């Protein structure tokens, strides 16, 4: 798999039941939040959502990749969810990616390594939206079912950098990640998906590192800030970003080099680079 497309066949979150409405319509007022009970309760809701989405898979012979909450440092929860999936879907648990928002970029990397022509993808995570007081409100668990498929013309992943980060301010990893991207890329970056949300200062540390990309960006570089529109949706965020990257005419008709920055507090920071390729380059 070089160039790829992402097709979302089912999208189910407390905020919207349609991915295009969520991306392109006026932002709806968020529903009333629900009381966060515990991660154990959230895991149970993730299992319920997984059963709902798995039942809608059309071709179960394709590889299936699960994009799941970033539970890197929560081994008990990770093992609980993995064990439940193995009991429910014993033939479809080879690829469980507990990376949250960065999982979708890891998915592309995996698809290239495995030389898949097409694969099923299910993303599940907790979702949050900012209220009128600019505080995150828990909405519940959301999920999406999609496919990733080889394309002759489209976006090709050229790099994927990932680093654990306990604290964005004290342990900022984006400086090193951006420096590596500059070393490995010579093409001008004309589109950046950035993770800031305007609520917590630590979420905008990517801005302080932007100068490291000065040789690759300029005043014409376009920025997408999905957290403002989508809220915090974890593993769903990465999938939605790739769907927008590969399907939006405003993007595919105008941009050639995209950078997708992902991060989750107390978890990780990451960035993936995508280059638009034509059929001639693909061949």
What do the predicted segments below correspond to?
Residues 1-126, 134-283:
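Conserved "HGTGT" condensation-loop signature of ketosynthase/thiolase-family condensing enzymes
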């Amino acid at each position: 798999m070089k160039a790829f497309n992402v097709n979302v066949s089912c999208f189910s979150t407390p905020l919207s039941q349609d991915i295009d409405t969520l991306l392109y319509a006026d932002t709806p007022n968020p529903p009333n939040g629900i009381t966060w009970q515990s991660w154990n309760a959230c895991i149970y809701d993730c299992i319920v959502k997984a059963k709902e989405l798995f039942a809608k898979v059309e071709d179960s012979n394709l590889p299936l990749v699960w994009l799941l909450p970033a539970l890197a440092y929560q081994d008990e929860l990770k093992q609980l969810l993995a064990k439940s999936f193995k009991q429910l879907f014993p033939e479809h648990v080879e690829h469980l990616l507990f990376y949250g928002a960065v999982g979708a970029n890891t998915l592309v990397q995996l698809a290239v390594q495995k030389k898949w022509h097409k694969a099923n993808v299910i993303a599940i995570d907790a979702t949050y939206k900012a209220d009128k007081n600019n505080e995150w409100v828990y909405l519940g668990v959301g999920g999406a079912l999609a496919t990733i498929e080889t394309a002759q013309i489209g976006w090709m992943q050229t790099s994927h950098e990932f680093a654990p980060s306990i604290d964005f301010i004290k342990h900022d990893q984006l400086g090193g990640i951006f420096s590596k991207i500059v070393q490995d890329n010579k093409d001008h970056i004309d589109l950046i998906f950035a993770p800031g949300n305007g609520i917590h200062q630590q979420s905008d540390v990517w801005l302080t590192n932007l100068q490291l990309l000065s040789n690759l960006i300029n005043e014409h570089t376009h920025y997408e800030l999905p957290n403002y529109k989508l809220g915090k949706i974890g593993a769903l965020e990465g999938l939605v970003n790739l769907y927008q990257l590969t399907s939006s005419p405003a993007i595919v008709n105008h941009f050639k080099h995209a950078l997708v920055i992902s991060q989750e507090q107390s978890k990780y920071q990451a960035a993936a680079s995508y280059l638009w390729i034509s059929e001639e380059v693909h061949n």
